[in-house]
Amino acid sequence: STPIKSSAASDVYKRQIDFIVRIDKVEIGEVNRMESDDKFAGGKGINVSRILQRLGIDNTATGFIGGFTGRFVTDSLDAEGIKTKFVAVDQDTRINVKIKADQETEINGTGPVINDYQLAELEAILSSVSADDVVVFAGSAPSNLGNKVYNKLIPLVRETGAQVVCDFEGQTLLDSLVYQPLLVKPNNHELEAIFNVKLNALADVEKYAREILAKGAQNVIISMAGDGALLVTPEATYFAKPIKGKVKNSVGAGDSMVAGFTGEFVKSGDPIEALKWGVACGTSTAFSDDLATIEFIKETYNKVEVEKL
């Protein structure tokens, strides 16, 4: 299978540890005792890498890593057999705390400052990919670099002949379309925000997804949470019906969908199969505490129904 370099040039920058704390109720100003906790290597790019690995697709995680927290991330990926090509930075990789009580609260770390030498090192890694690679960029860039840095990084990949997948929001997503990404995946709310419209029917969603296609994307998936997902290609539009279940992990679900679609598309070039695997990965992660296991993904894949509109 084609090796995928799964790199998220910013959420890759923002490699993180997700520290998940479970507690009945948080009493502010009091000593609270957690019932259970989990620590995962996190960040959008890492999530993509971990799902690709479960699907048996060779990939390399890249980005910035630092400190004892960075070692935890690298060790976690090593344990899953994922290859890494990280740039070392001076400050610690951030920790994001997710408190799951009667309500869910997040406290996100700031993440390291990236200097010019470190950025140049990442640029060298991205410039060295081969024409049959796909590079996944995801999320917002570190604050000291800003999202404009993508306009510098994505062309480095495209000049090698490699494809890019761009999992961005808003203006950053629009700016990326000039590089003809293999896939972009805004959800319906992000699509509304981009065009400043209200989407009432599937036909509206398709109309604006086609506008994104016209601006340069090769495939556009609009995920609609409990209402399924729409894939728009130059040839056709496909709708994947929603699958019912209890949502536990909405954050990793989108990243899992990106991994499932990209991995299958690179293998088979079949957009319908790619959509099915994307929906299977996204849905099964949504119904899991951590990212979905391959067993659960395969089980969910058998429930995915796709119709051509």
What does each of the following model-derived ranges do?
Residues 49-58, 263-268:
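Alpha-helix C-terminal capping segments
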Residues 1-9, 13:
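Single conserved hydrophobic/aromatic residue that forms the stacking wall/gate
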Residues 54-133, 301-309:
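Conserved N-terminal subdomain of the carbohydrate kinase-like
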